C-alpha cells in the first residue's frame, strides 16, 4: 500500500514501509511498539488533565458569585459544586477556594503525566515486553488482554467508590431535594436494595419511564455507585484470575483494532446516556448549577404567572383559557391536577421547588392558594427566563421573551456535545469494527493503489 509519491517520509524513525501506516495514521504506527504507545497514551492523559486544570482555573478567574453558574458559561464548576465543594443552602457559592485547589492539583498532575509521556515517547524502551514483562503485551494474547480489562474494571470500580466515600464520609454532596431549596448533605443511608437499583435498568427508556435517567434522589444515585463499584471490582478480579471461555475466544476478534472498536462503541453508549442524563435529570445535575431542564423552565413559567395572577385576584382553580381548557390548572388524562396551557405536555415534571405543592392527586389547590414560599417564586421566575435553549452563535434564551438573558445553558452545551461526540464515536466504532473483522477474515488489503491516477502524475513541485 502506497500513499506518498516517493515513500521516503520519516516521522520519528517510524516510516510507512516499516509500519504500513503513513504519518497521519498517528498511533496506528505504534501498534506493535508497546513502549511508544504507552508514551502516546500518557501524553494524551496529560493533555486531558491539563485542559481540566487550566479550564478550571479559567472558570474560577471569571466566576461572579452574584450570578448563577449556568448564566456564566461554566461547565466545570457546576460539577465541583454538585460534589458539595464551596456551596451552601440553595446552591449559593460561599467559597471558591476548593475550585482553585482543584485546578492547581490538575495542573500539577498534568505536568507529571506530560513528563511521563515525553519520556516514554522519546527516551524509554520502544517495547516493554523484554524489560518489563508485566507491562508488556501481545494483542493476540487473550489471557493478557482480559487481565488488562480486569485492571481497568478495578480502577473504574474504585472511582465509583470514591464518589460513595465523598457522599457518605467526606462532607457529603449537594442534594437539590434538601428541604428549603437544596443543600449539601451527607448521604447516611444509600439505597442497597438490588430491586430498586437494578429496577432502573429494567425500565423503558421511553416516555415517563426514563430508564436510569429517571433517578430522582441522592440515596439511589449513591447506592447505584456502591453497587457498580463492587460489581466492577468483582468483575475485574474475575477477569484477572480467569482465561476467556471457548465461546468468547471464537466469537470475538482479538486484535488491537478490534479492542479500539469495542472501546469506541462503549464510549458511544456512555455519551448518548450522558446526553439524556444531563438534559432531563435535575437530581444528578442540579438546576441550581446547570440551569433548569426544558420541562422545568416551561412549568416554571406557568407557575410564575399563576402566582402573579392569583395575587391580582384571579381564581386560578376555575379560570378558562382561550381553548376552553383551564388557563392555570387542568386535569391530566388520568385525573391529576396539572398546570394548564402549553406546558400540559410536561405535566410529569418533578422539581424540588414544585413538589411541596403537590397532594395525593396532583397539584393541591389549597397549597397553591396558601403555602407558596418566596424561594419557590424566586426560583421559578429565574428558571422561566433561563430555558435551556441556544444557538451556534451563543445567543440563548427564549427568542420572544423580553426578560430573557443572552446565554447558552450548560445543559444545552453538555447534552449537544455528548450527542455529537457520541455519534462520531459510534461511526468510528463501525469503521474500526469493519476493518478489524475484515483483517481477521483475511481480505483487508487496503485500497488498491496500482491504478491510482495520481501515481502517474508529476510531483506538485
From Swiss-Prot:
One of its GO terms (molecular function) is metal ion binding. Residues 1-2 form a propeptide. [CaMn4O5] cluster binds at residue 355. GO terms for biological process: photosynthetic electron transport in photosystem II. The modification Phosphothreonine is found at residue 3. PSII is composed of 1 copy each of membrane proteins PsbA, PsbB, PsbC, PsbD, PsbE, PsbF, PsbH, PsbI, PsbJ, PsbK, PsbL, PsbM, PsbT, PsbX, PsbY, PsbZ, Psb30/Ycf12, at least 3 peripheral proteins of the oxygen-evolving complex and a large number of cofactors. It forms dimeric complexes. This is Photosystem II CP43 reaction center protein. It comes from Chlorokybus atmophyticus (Soil alga).
Amino acid at each position: 500500500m502506497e500513499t506518498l509519491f516517493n515513500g521516503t517520509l520519516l516521522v520519528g524513525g517510524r516510516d510507512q514501509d516499516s509500519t504500513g501506516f503513513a504519518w497521519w495514521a498517528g498511533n496506528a504506527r505504534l501498534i506493535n511498539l508497546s513502549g511508544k504507545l504507552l508514551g502516546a497514551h500518557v501524553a494524551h492523559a496529560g493533555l486531558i488533565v491539563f485542559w481540566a486544570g487550566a479550564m478550571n482555573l479559567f472558570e474560577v478567574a471569571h466566576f461572579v458569585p452574584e450570578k448563577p453558574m449556568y448564566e456564566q458559561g461554566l461547565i466545570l464548576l457546576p460539577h465541583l459544586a454538585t460534589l458539595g465543594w464551596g456551596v451552601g443552602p440553595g446552591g449559593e457559592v460561599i467559597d471558591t477556594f476548593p475550585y482553585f485547589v482543584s485546578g492547581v492539583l490538575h495542573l500539577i498532575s498534568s505536568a507529571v503525566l506530560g513528563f511521563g509521556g515525553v519520556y516514554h515517547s522519546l527516551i524509554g524502551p520502544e517495547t516493554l515486553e523484554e524489560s518489563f514483562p508485566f507491562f508488556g503485551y501481545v494483542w493476540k494474547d487473550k489471557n493478557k488482554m482480559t487481565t488488562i480489562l480486569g485492571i481497568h474494571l478495578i480502577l473504574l470500580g474504585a472511582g465509583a467508590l470514591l464518589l460513595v466515600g465523598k457522599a457518605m464520609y467526606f462532607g457529603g454532596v449537594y442534594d437539590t431535594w434538601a428541604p428549603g431549596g437544596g443543600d449539601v448533605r451527607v448521604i447516611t443511608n444509600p439505597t442497597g436494595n438490588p430491586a430498586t437499583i437494578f429496577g432502573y435498568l429494567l425500565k423503558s427508556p421511553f416516555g415517563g419511564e426514563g430508564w436510569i435517567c429517571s433517578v430522582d434522589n441522592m440515596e439511589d444515585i449513591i447506592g447505584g455507585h456502591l453497587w457498580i463499584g463492587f460489581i466492577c471490582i468483582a468483575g475485574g478480579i474475575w477477569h484477572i484470575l480467569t482465561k476467556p471461555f471457548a465461546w468468547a475466544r471464537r466469537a470475538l476478534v482479538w486484535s488491537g483494532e478490534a479492542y479500539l472498536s469495542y472501546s469506541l462503541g462503549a464510549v458511544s453508549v456512555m455519551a448518548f446516556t450522558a446526553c439524556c442524563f444531563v438534559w432531563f435529570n435535575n437530581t444528578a445535575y442540579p438546576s441550581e448549577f446547570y440551569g433548569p431542564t426544558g420541562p422545568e423552565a416551561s412549568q416554571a413559567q406557568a407557575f410564575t404567572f399563576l402566582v402573579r395572577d392569583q395575587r391580582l385576584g384571579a381564581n386560578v382553580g376555575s379560570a378558562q383559557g382561550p381553548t376552553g381548557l383551564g388557563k392555570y390548572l387542568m386535569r391530566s388524562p388520568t385525573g391529576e391536577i396539572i398546570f394548564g396551557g402549553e406546558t400540559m405536555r410536561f405535566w410529569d415534571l418533578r422539581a424540588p421547588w414544585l413538589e411541596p405543592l403537590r397532594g395525593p392527586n396532583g397539584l393541591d389547590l389549597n397549597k397553591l392558594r396558601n403555602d407558596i414560599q418566596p424561594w419557590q417564586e424566586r426560583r421559578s421566575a429565574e428558571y422561566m427566563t433561563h430555558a435551556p435553549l441556544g444557538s451556534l452563535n451563543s445567543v440563548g434564551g427564549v427568542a420572544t421573551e423580553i426578560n430573557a438573558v443572552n446565554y447558552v445553558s450548560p445543559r444545552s452545551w453538555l447534552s449537544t456535545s455528548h450527542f455529537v461526540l457520541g455519534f462520531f464515536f459510534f461511526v468510528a466504532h463501525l469503521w474500526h469494527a469493519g476493518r478489524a473483522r475484515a483483517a481477521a477474515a483475511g481480505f483487508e488489503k487496503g485500497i488498491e493503489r496500482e491504478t491510482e491516477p495520481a501515481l502517474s502524475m508529476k510531483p506538485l513541485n
